[in-house]
From Swiss-Prot:
<dbReference type="GO" id="GO:0000502">
    <property type="term" value="C:proteasome complex"/>
</dbReference>
<dbReference type="GO" id="GO:0006511">
    <property type="term" value="P:ubiquitin-dependent protein catabolic process"/>
</dbReference>
<keyword id="KW-0539">Nucleus</keyword>
<dbReference type="InterPro" id="IPR000426">
    <property type="entry name" value="Proteasome_asu_N"/>
</dbReference>
<comment type="function">
    <text>The proteasome is a multicatalytic proteinase complex which is characterized by its ability to cleave peptides with Arg, Phe, Tyr, Leu, and Glu adjacent to the leaving group at neutral or slightly basic pH. The proteasome has an ATP-dependent proteolytic activity.</text>
</comment>
<dbReference type="Pfam" id="PF10584">
    <property type="entry name" value="Proteasome_A_N"/>
</dbReference>
<dbReference type="GO" id="GO:0019773">
    <property type="term" value="C:proteasome core complex, alpha-subunit complex"/>
</dbReference>
<keyword id="KW-0832">Ubl conjugation</keyword>
<dbReference type="Pfam" id="PF00227">
    <property type="entry name" value="Proteasome"/>
</dbReference>
<dbReference type="InterPro" id="IPR001353">
    <property type="entry name" value="Proteasome_sua/b"/>
</dbReference>
<comment type="subunit">
    <text>Component of the 20S core complex of the 26S proteasome. The 26S proteasome is composed of a core protease (CP), known as the 20S proteasome, capped at one or both ends by the 19S regulatory particle (RP/PA700). The 20S proteasome core is composed of 28 subunits that are arranged in four stacked rings, resulting in a barrel-shaped structure. The two end rings are each formed by seven alpha subunits, and the two central rings are each formed by seven beta subunits. The catalytic chamber with the active sites is on the inside of the barrel.</text>
</comment>
<dbReference type="InterPro" id="IPR029055">
    <property type="entry name" value="Ntn_hydrolases_N"/>
</dbReference>
<dbReference type="GO" id="GO:0005773">
    <property type="term" value="C:vacuole"/>
</dbReference>
<dbReference type="InterPro" id="IPR050115">
    <property type="entry name" value="Proteasome_alpha"/>
</dbReference>
<protein>
    <recommendedName>
        <fullName>Proteasome subunit alpha type-7-B</fullName>
    </recommendedName>
</protein>
<comment type="similarity">
    <text>Belongs to the peptidase T1A family.</text>
</comment>
<keyword id="KW-0963">Cytoplasm</keyword>
Amino acid sequence: MARYDRAITVFSPDGHLFQVEYALEAVRKGNAAVGVRGTDTVVLAVEKKSTPKLQDSRSARKIVSLDNHIALACAGLKADARVLINKARIECQSHRLTLEDPVTVEYITRYIAGLQQKYTQSGGVRPFGLSTLIVGFDPYSRLPSLYQTDPSGTFSAWKANATGRNSNSIREFLEKNYKESSGQETIKLAIRALLEVVESGGKNIEVAVMTREETGLRQLEEAEIDAIVAKIEAEKAAAEAAKKGPPKET
């Protein structure tokens, strides 16, 4: 095996950092995650695996709060996510304690992306094998935000985006169907996008919502998700029936 394939800080002759590319591959094999930014709502939806009967499903959640006004979902290695989330939470608390002000969504995104980039350039470590979707409301303007970071340390702002397995298919769906909306329509779009790749319906979907009016992140209950999925399926069936037209008379 070539030296640049083993070493994190050595470029290959054609300009690749293979350890970063391997981390990106870990993201592509991870659970699908979707983020949608509405006018007054931000939504994160992730694909979740079925939990054993004896496991507390709350301990396996993939959407977490970083602060009262910021939440994060990720795709990739769960253990790596735990480390990154803990560091981000400490930074949020430190910022409040030192400056007596909450962090902005962009600030904590830059911090997380900076950590990920640092781990592509340092000896004795490896890149974080995860990509994050970060949503929240600016504490001053109260405007909604959605950002994505990846293992290379790159970050960017989005109206709607996806990461994890089949993220390209989900992103194409979002590009065709995204309209700036509010409330339930934003939630419905996120779930519709995830259903493009999740075949088992609402039981394997985790959804969390943050609104301008309410403080904190609200995890949707299974019954709420099932009701929205049923509505989406009914609308889809009605649209297909409309395409076929009325039955022909014999």
